[in-house]
UniProtKB/Swiss-Prot annotation:
Protein name per Swiss-Prot or TrEMBL: Insulin-like growth factor-binding protein complex acid labile subunit
Subcellular location: Secreted, Extracellular space
Entry's Gene Ontology BP terms: cell adhesion
Renumbered ranges of LRR repeats: 75-96, 99-120, 123-144, 147-168, 171-192, 195-216, 219-240, 243-264, 267-288, 291-312, 315-336, 339-360, 363-384, 387-408, 411-432, 435-456, 459-480, 483-504, 507-528
Glycan attachment sites: 64, 85, 96, 368, 515, 578, 586
Main location, first listed in the record: secreted
Classification via InterPro entries: Cys-rich_flank_reg_C (IPR000483), Leu-rich_rpt (IPR001611), Leu-rich_rpt_typical-subtyp (IPR003591), LRR_dom_sf (IPR032675), LRRNT (IPR000372)
SMART domains reported in the protein's UniProt record: LRR_SD22, LRR_TYP, LRRCT, LRRNT
Stretch forming the signal peptide: 1-23
Known role: May have an important role in regulating the access of circulating IGFs to the tissues.
Binding partners and assembly: Forms a ternary complex with IGF1 and IGFBP3.
């Protein structure tokens, strides 16, 4: 399905390469035959004959053709005419190609097709007419293609569809009408398409859907109505689609969803209502969606969530509610969502979360609460979320982490707390997070870390503490982090690291100490990258060990790193890692690595 389950252009390209086999002919003799005794290839085209399938493909793509080439072999199975300048297709243009089952006319500046243009194509299976300039199609255009299974009319200028346009296409499986200018569709335009599985109507100007429109599409599996101008979802519109699995209603102007609008859609697995103007959800908005797995409601205007709103969605796995106007999460807001794995509530206006708000979310693995203004979280608010492995609380106005804020999160792997105003973290408030692998406290207001803050975090690998106000770290604060691999302490106010501060970090490979107030430092063995620039280094005897280490390990302490650059116009960006001396006066401004060895002879 276009833009949702795979690009038709990709299918076309793959088919092209499959068609190119050992019998591919091109170049020296444009009129060469497909094989020694086969039919002649048109002069302006290239032909490929597949011995295994006994199929002939004719490639006339992007040849600047203004009319169809002469001499297309009658045995042709696939004909590629895309990327030309054909303008129109005359009557009976393909009448001798009764074996044709694939015809590609996309991107050929077509403005019209004569009513009899497809005469003789009774075995045609795939027809690509997308990316042209078609404004209308004759009512009987497709009566000569009864075998058609896939029809793509996307990205044209169609403003209306004639009654009976698709009559007789009982085998049609995939119909793409997306990205046209359709405002209203006739009630019976899809009548007779009983085998249709995928219907794309995205990118049009539809303002409403009449219940009769989708009658007879009982086999439909996927319906894309995104990027239209729909203002509401009314009851009974989708009642005749019992097998529909995916419904896209995103990027419309929907302000309201009628009660029981999706009743009877037991097969629906994916419902996208994001990027609309929905202001509220009722308790009976989603009844009947017993098989729903994904519900997307992000980028709406929802201000509150009522208890039991999602009570019937027992098999829901993903619920997206980010970028709304939700102010509070009350008790049992998500009751009934026992199978939910992903919950996004980012970028709302949530200022209060009640204890019990997440009751029943036994299987949730990822929760995003970032971009709200929580200020504080009640203790035990996450109790019962033992399977949660990623918790996002970035940019949430948090000022303090209490002792039992994260109680119950025994399975948490990643905790993101960056860009808050955290100035206080209570001792052992992280002690229950024994499975934690990554902790991000970047860009807060921490001035010190409690001695036992990391007690119990023996699995932690990534610790990010940059852009705080740390002036010192006690020598045993990092002791429990024996598996730490990556430590970022940049952009703080650290002066003199305690002796042995990093000695217990035997697996440490990345250490960032740039932009602190360090004057001396003894490097840690085993490091693979060490950042030290923007410190007021005292380049006297205490720094000799660092000088020797930097000179012996230029890959660990590089003078600069060039950022990977992509694109023709991309300018390389260099990150410098200077060890600039602030003193003594005779070496001030020099890089430690450039100072003569003689200055350290008496050290």
């Amino acid at each position: 399905m276009a833009l949702r389950t795979g690009s038709p252009a990709l299918v076309v390209l793959l088919a092209f390469w499959v068609a190119l086999g050992p019998c591919y002919l091109q170049g020296t003799d444009p009129g060469a035959s497909a094989d020694a005794e086969g039919p002649q290839c048109p002069v302006t085209c290239t032909c490929s004959y597949d011995d295994y399938t006994d199929e002939l493909s004719v490639f006339c793509s992007s040849r600047n053709l203004t009319q169809l080439p002469d001499g297309i072999p009658v045995s042709t199975r696939a004909l590629w005419l895309d990327g030309n300048n054909l303008s129109s297709i005359p009557s009976a243009a393909f009448q001798n190609l009764s074996s044709l089952d694939f015809l590609n006319l996309q991107g050929s500046w077509l403005r019209s097709l004569e009513p009899q243009a497809l005469l003789g194509l009774q075995n045609l299976y795939h027809l690509h007419l997308e990316r042209n300039l078609l404004r209308s199609l004759a009512a009987g255009l497709f009566r000569h293609t009864p075998s058609l299974a896939s029809l793509s009319l996307g990205n044209n200028l169609l403003g209306r569809l004639e009654e009976g346009l698709f009559r007789g296409l009982s085998h049609l499986w995939d119909l793409n009408l997306g990205w046209n200018s359709l405002v209203v569709l006739p009630d019976t335009v899809f009548q007779g398409l009983g085998n249709l599985h995928e219907l794309v109507l995205a990118g049009n100007k539809l303002t409403y859907l009449q219940p009769a429109l989708l009658c007879g599409l009982g086999e439909l599996r996927e319906l894309d109505l995104s990027r239209n101008a729909l203002r509401s979802v009314k009851a009974n519109v989708f009642i005749h689609l019992p097998r529909l699995q995916k419904l896209y209603l995103d990027r419309n102007l929907i302000t309201a969803v009628a009660p029981r609008a999706f009743l009877g859609m037991k097969a629906l697995r994916w419902l996208d209502l994001s990027h609309n103007r929905v202001a509220g959800l009722l308790e009976d908005t989603f009844p009947g969606l017993l098989g729903l797995h994904v519900l997307r409601l992000a980028h709406n205007a929802i201000t509150s969530l009522r208890p039991r709103t999602f009570k019937d969605l027992h098999f829901l796995e993903e619920l997206q509610l980010g970028h709304n106007r939700i102010r509070q999460l009350g008790e049992k807001t998500f009751e009934g969502l026992g199978q939910l794995e992903v919950l996004t509530l980012n970028d709302n206006q949530i200022h209060e979360v009640k204890v019990g708000a997440f009751f029943g979310l036994f299987n949730v693995a990822v929760m995003n609460l970032s971009g709200n203004c929580l200020r504080s979280l009640p203790e035990h608010v996450f109790q019962g979320l033992g399977r949660l492995h990623s918790l996002h609380l970035e940019h949430s106005c948090l000022g303090r982490i209490r002792l039992h804020t994260f109680a119950g999160l025994s399975g948490l792997r990643r905790l993101f707390l960056r860009d808050n105003s955290i100035s206080s973290i209570e001792e052992q408030s992280l002690a229950g997070l024994s499975e934690l692998l990554e902790l991000d406290l970047t860009a807060n207001q921490l001035t010190h870390l409690p001695r036992q803050l990391f007690q119990g975090l023996g699995q932690l690998e990534y610790l990010l503490l940059s852009n705080n106000q740390l002036t010192m770290l006690s020598e045993d604060v990092l002791g429990p982090l024996q598996r730490a691999f990556w430590l970022d302490l940049s952009h703080n106010r650290l002066e003199t690291p305690a002796e042995g501060l990093f000695s217990s970090l035997g697996r440490l490979r990345y250490l960032n100490l740039r932009n602190n107030s360090l004057q001396t430092f003894v490097p840690q063995p085993g490091l693979e990258r060490l950042w030290l620039d923007a410190n007021p280094w005292d380049c006297s005897c205490p720094l000799k060990a660092l000088r020797d280490f930097a000179l012996q390990n230029p890959g660990v302490v590089p003078r600069f790193v060039q950022t990977v650059c992509e694109g023709d116009d991309c300018q390389p960006v260099y990150t410098y890692n200077n060890i600039t001396c602030a003193g003594p006066a005779n070496v001030s401004g020099l890089d430690l690595r450039d100072i003569s060895e003689t200055l350290f002879v008496h050290c």
